[in-house]
Amino acid sequence: DEWRYWQADLLMERGRDDEARSILLALMQQRGFYPMVAAQRLGEPYPLRVEKAPGTISSTLTGGAEMARVRELMYWNQDNTARSEWANLVSSRSQTEQAQLARYAFDQNWWDLSVQATIAGKLWDNLQERFPLAYKDLFTRYTSGKDVPQSYAMAIARQESAWNPKVKSPVGASGLMQIMPGTATHTVKMFNLPGYSNPVQ
């Protein structure tokens, strides 16, 4: 997508507007950043496709032993083990069932599992389950009165952690925003934030 956009840009620069327009029109039919920019450049509305999870989730999916294990593990905050069970459950299902599982996880506020199901099922147009507005109250509270838009902070968290609050990178970054312990300590001191005592928080 990127090279096609820049090819059209170069053609426009050289006065070959018809060729450039043809490339941009074709490009804007795709999903992604450059297709959106192509539509914007042409002054056309971007045809955003949003899929909805199909119907009610099957009781065989929610009532099975695999889902019972996931629910139990999530209840006892054994999130990493639950994620492993979830990955096995999702990978063994059809795309329709994966969409239903993504929706089920979304409805349970298991946002990271919802995201995981959309990725496993390549459900790129299931935007609500793929990009849930997770932890919205938390982000509202901590971005209020700051020069950081809430949507930007949430986008960073989604990108960094896929909404898994317990994820830890190989280099030690952790949490929704994937903050390094040293950065957390420095930020607390710089802004005199109360209630922080160690990197485990």
Where do the model's predicted regions map?
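Acidic, proline-/serine-/threonine-rich low-complexity intrinsically disordered segments
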Residues: 45, 62-63, 112
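Short, solvent-exposed, mixed-charge loop/turn linkers that connect secondary-structure elements
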Residues: 43-52
